């Protein structure tokens, strides 16, 4: 099912589209990730600290590390999504609705194959160990510790909310990719008008 990518922009143009679409989708959902904290009644940025603290960073630096990691991964997912879509005819984004649909599927795949294992088998155990260990490398304030323990307690909510946000991220990624790639596939014959 593979076909050759013979577009004039080539691979570099596809990578640029992937970076742009991934960054837009990642930034569009930034406030939604902060709403996880609001839903659990914990200080803003606590969810992002679950990435920074296991890396040995504390305080506001942990929030920044978490944010930068999310944005970087969003750009990488955008690149992988657009390269895959340009090389496999089945996934080629010839219309915006097809981009949204394939993006939503991509978001579900990213959640199940990347986020879920990393969150449950790597980040949460490291965070729990850091919080329970008296000789931790990271010094966590009592308020931060209480908020992080509340986040761990609400882990089921975090997982369901994250699943929804990953599908939404993928939909926005597909939407932006469809907008950016519209001219490239203008003359491609359509199946049932949108596919």
Residue map of PLM features:
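Juxtamembrane/disordered regions of integral membrane proteins
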Residues: 2-195
């Amino acid at each position: 099912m593979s076909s050759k990518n013979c577009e004039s922009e080539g691979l570099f143009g596809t990578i640029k589209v992937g970076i742009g679409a991934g960054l837009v989708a990642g930034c569009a959902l930034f406030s939604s990730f902060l709403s996880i904290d609001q839903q659990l009644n914990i200080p803003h940025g606590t969810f992002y600290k679950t990435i920074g603290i296991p890396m040995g960073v504390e305080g506001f630096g942990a929030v920044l590390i978490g944010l930068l990691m999310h944005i970087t991964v969003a750009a990488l997912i955008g690149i992988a999504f657009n390269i895959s879509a340009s090389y496999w005819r089945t996934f080629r984004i010839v219309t915006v609705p097809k981009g949204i649909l394939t993006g939503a599927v991509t978001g579900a795949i990213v959640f199940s194959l990347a986020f879920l294992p990393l969150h449950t088998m790597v980040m949460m155990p490291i965070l729990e160990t850091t919080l329970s260990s008296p000789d931790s490398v990271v010094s966590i304030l009592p308020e931060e510790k209480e908020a992080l323990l509340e986040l761990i307690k609400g882990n089921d909510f975090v997982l369901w909310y994250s699943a929804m946000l990953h599908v939404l991220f993928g939909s926005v990624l597909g939407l932006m990719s469809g907008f950016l790639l519209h001219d490239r596939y203008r003359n491609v014959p359509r199946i049932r008008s949108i596919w």
